[in-house]
Amino acid sequence: MELPAVNLKVILLGHWLLTTWGCIVFSGSYAWANFTILALGVWAVAQRDSIDAISMFLGGLLATIFLDIVHISIFYPRAGLTDTGRFGAGMAILSLLLKPLSCCFVYHMYRQRGGFLGSSQDRSAYQTIDSAEAPANAFAVPEGRGQDARGY
């Protein structure tokens, strides 16, 4: 299944807007966690070829899914919620619901930048130092053969 091309800037703008509205009700640690991850997203936009930037943004998005669940479940006001408060809580919940989809798009971008999740990568193109294979230069002559040692 081919994912549609979604610009990273659109993902950032959407989550920034939803996080800003979510901060109407949930401030403090909710704001710090989400805006810090959005700063990593800005870094990923600024450095288009960086695998580190996009992988840290992806990891941060995954972490904020868990953190948002904790923040919303602990700090959701049970009584006296105004219309503005309901709107802010709804936007925070909408941001939480959209984060897994955003993670899929960001993971796709991570793979496009050359990222690979796993411990073993293909290293068949590399030659080990103690390899006994012939040198790459066909005209290279091993030491002591074909050349006279000249002393001064």
From Swiss-Prot:
InterPro entries: AGTRAP (IPR009436). It comes from the Eukaryota. The modification Phosphothreonine is found at residue 128. The keyword Transmembrane helix applies. Keywords: Cytoplasmic vesicle, Endoplasmic reticulum, Golgi apparatus, Membrane, Phosphoprotein, Transmembrane, Transmembrane helix. The modification Phosphoserine is found at residues 119-120, 131. The chain crosses the membrane at residues 24-44, 56-76, 87-107. One of its GO terms (cellular component) is cytoplasmic vesicle membrane. Residues 45-55, 108-152 are cytoplasmic. It is a multi-pass membrane protein. Residues 1-23, 77-86 are extracellular. The keyword Magnesium does not apply. GO terms for biological process: angiotensin-activated signaling pathway; regulation of blood pressure. Its main location: endoplasmic reticulum. Appears to be a negative regulator of type-1 angiotensin II receptor-mediated signaling by regulating receptor internalization as well as mechanism of receptor desensitization such as phosphorylation. Also induces a decrease in cell proliferation and angiotensin II-stimulated transcriptional activity. PANTHER family: TYPE-1 ANGIOTENSIN II RECEPTOR-ASSOCIATED PROTEIN (PTHR16521:SF3). This is Type-1 angiotensin II receptor-associated protein. It comes from Pongo abelii. The gene is AGTRAP.
